[in-house]
Amino acid sequence: MGDIEKQTEIREKKARNVMRELKIQKLCLNICVGESGDRLTRAAKVLEQLTGQTPVFSKARYTVRTFGIRRNEKIAVHCTVRGPKAEEILEKGLKVKEYELYKENFSDTGNFGFGVQEHIDLGIKYDPSIGIYGMDFYVVLDRAGRRIAKRRRAPGRVGPSHRVEREESIKWFQQKYDGIILPPKPKVKRTFHRRR
C-alpha cells in the first residue's frame, strides 16, 4: 500500500465518521425595523406566525440622532429556532433564494446567513394590517461534541481539526440542498473627481 492509498483510506474513514457530520445547531431569524412602536409589534407577529414561538425584542446599543434612535429603545425583533422546525424554515428560506448563495454569505467559522426581502414568499398569507417585512436568516452549523466547550463543569476546548470551517459548510450546503455557489459580485469602482 502506497502513501496515497493510505491517505485516501483515512479520508474515507473520516467521511464516514458520525462525529464528523455537520448539523444545524440553530437558526436565528431577525427583523430590524429601526424604530419602536406599531411597526415593531407587527414584525413580531410575522415572526410568531412563521416560527410558532414568542420572539424577543432587541434594544439599540447607543443613540444615533441621524436615524432617530435612542439608547435602549427597542428597534428589532429576533427568534432562535432549533431542531426539525429550524430545518423546515431554512428550507423555505433557501427556496426563496432558489438555493443560490454567494461565497461571502459563509463565515470563517462555518456559519452562513442570507436575507429575504418579503416574508410572504415564505408561505405566510398576506395581511394588509401587518404589511410586508424582510428578514435575515443566520444558520449556525456544528459537529457532535460541541458541548465540551460550553458546559459549566470541566469545560474543554474543541480542537482545530474538529471545528467547522468555511469550505466544509459550503460543501455541506451543496450536498444537502443541491445548492449553487454564485461567483462574487463585481466590485463597483468609484471615481473621485478632484476639485480644480
Swiss-Prot record:
User: Which Gene Ontology cellular component terms are annotated?
Assistant: cytosolic large ribosomal subunit; nucleus
Disulfide pairs here are none
Give compartment(s): Nucleus; Cytoplasm
**Residues in coiled coil:** none
One Gene Ontology MF term: RNA binding
Q: Its family?
A: Belongs to the universal ribosomal protein uL5 family.
Subunit structure of this chain's protein: Component of the large ribosomal subunit.
Q: What else is known?
A: There's a functional difference between the two L11-encoding proteins in C.elegans. rpl-11.1 plays a role in the germline whereas rpl-11.2 has a somatic function.
Q: What is this protein called?
A: Large ribosomal subunit protein uL5B
Q: Which organism is it from?
A: Caenorhabditis elegans
